[in-house]
């Protein structure tokens, strides 16, 4: 256990060329890819409504379960999935309260980490899937990490993008912020739609572009907002599709000790793709500590640093796809 390959990909060494590698002096057949149109909308009934998704590839095979980041949606994978092999299936999910999925009923809070683990389990049990492969970005990667730790014998491969484990907060910060978070949650819960800000399409795109602070470019924002906003006919403008209550994220955060305890439970093969510079973490050392802990316990760990923003799989998917393809092909 603990076998590791560490690779640093530079802009001058573009991984896109690895899609058609040469082996033993002979050029392999070009890899057949999924392409942009190989998906269908997919709906999963849950007790509070539906979880909506995009199913990429054939429904005749068990899919990779893909989970997006906080306040994003499954459109986050719209540029990556087309670059994956045609014999791959991916179920990219809109997490509850995101994209086209149902919001939680009034009176309920989003405990995003614990809710997400339960959602994955609900789906796996519903379809009786075995030896699952999980793909996650940011929050989605924290959820897949937690699931792999909670069900260590039932996950075959774990692929995470620019996240090592759940977001870590200092205990003092969590204690000091709890009251404000609860009041903020209740304010959002009681805010009527008539008082929610409404924007023109162009205003919405600019607002989101500015909010992501360089992590995405304008074409990427347009991809995300295909599922991230909804039209309001009465105001002739657009509202965010996501549940406003999701903006309260402090509740349910982890300490470093908790995250490392879960890391020690993971036994599957792991690919971790970290963007450089990627996301700015409050506790950057924890990322390295999680990877080190995984190396001690997981069947195999591949840690790769790739030039890009936190949303590198969306903005520069050609840099990310070759690493995933290679990892999926490995026995």
Swiss-Prot record:
PROSITE patterns membership: LIPASE_SER
Pfam families: Abhydrolase_1
Domain AB hydrolase-1: 63-163
Tissue specificity statement from the Swiss-Prot or TrEMBL entry: Ubiquitously expressed before embryonic stage 11. At stage 11, expression is concentrated in the foregut and posterior midgut. By stage 15, in gastric caeca, pharynx, posterior spiracles and anterior edge of midgut. At the end of embryogenesis, expression is confined to gastric caeca. During third instar larvae, expressed at low levels in gastric caeca, midgut and hindgut and high level in fat body.
GO molecular function, one term: serine hydrolase activity
Region annotation Disordered: where it falls in the sequence: 1-28
Sequence ranges of Low complexity compositional bias: 7-17
Biological process per Gene Ontology, one example term: response to toxic substance
InterPro entries: AB_hydrolase_1, AB_hydrolase_fold, AB_hydrolase_sf
EC number: 3.1.-.-
Active site: 138
Keyword terms, alphabetized: Detoxification, Developmental protein, Digestion, Hydrolase, Serine esterase
PANTHER family according to UniProt: MONOACYLGLYCEROL LIPASE, SERINE HYDROLASE-LIKE PROTEIN DDB_G0286239
Family membership noted in the UniProt record: Belongs to the AB hydrolase superfamily.
Function: May have a role in detoxification and digestion during embryogenesis and larval development.
Descriptive protein name: Probable serine hydrolase
């Amino acid at each position: 256990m603990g076998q590791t390959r560490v690779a640093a990909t530079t802009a001058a060494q573009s991984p896109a060329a690895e899609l058609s590698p040469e082996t033993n002096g002979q050029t392999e057949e070009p890899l057949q890819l999924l392409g942009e149109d190989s998906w269908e909308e997919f709906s999963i009934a849950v007790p509070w409504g539906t979880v909506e998704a995009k199913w990429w590839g054939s429904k005749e095979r068990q899919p990779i379960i893909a989970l997006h980041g906080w306040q994003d949606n499954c459109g986050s994978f719209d540029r990556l999935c087309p670059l994956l092999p045609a014999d791959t299936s991916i179920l990219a999910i809109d997490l509850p309260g995101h994209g086209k999925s149902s919001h939680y009923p009034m009176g309920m809070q989003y405990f995003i980490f614990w809710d997400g683990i339960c959602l994955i389990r609900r789906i796996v049990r519903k379809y009786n899937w075995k030896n699952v492969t999980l793909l996650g970005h940011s929050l989605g990667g924290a959820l897949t990490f937690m699931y792999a730790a909670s069900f260590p014998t039932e996950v075959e491969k774990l692929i995470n993008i620019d996240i090592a484990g759940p977001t870590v907060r200092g205990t003092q910060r969590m204690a000091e912020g709890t009251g404000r978070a609860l009041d903020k949650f209740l304010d959002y819960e009681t805010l009527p739609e008539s008082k929610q800000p409404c924007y023109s399409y162009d205003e919405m795109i600019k607002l989101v572009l500015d909010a992501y602070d360089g992590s995405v470019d304008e074409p990427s924002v347009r991809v995300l907002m295909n599922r991230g906003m909804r039209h309001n006919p009465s105001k002739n403008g657009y509202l965010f599709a996501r549940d406003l209550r999701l903006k309260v994220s402090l509740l349910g955060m982890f300490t470093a000790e908790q995250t490392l305890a879960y890391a020690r439970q993971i036994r599957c093969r792991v690919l971790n793709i970290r963007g450089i510079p990627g996301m700015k973490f409050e506790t950057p050392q924890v990322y390295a500590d999680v990877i080190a802990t995984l190396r001690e316990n997981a069947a195999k760990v591949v840690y790769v640093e790739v030039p890009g923003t936190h949303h590198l799989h969306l903005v520069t998917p050609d840099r990310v796809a070759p690493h995933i393809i290679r990892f999926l092909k490995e026995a």
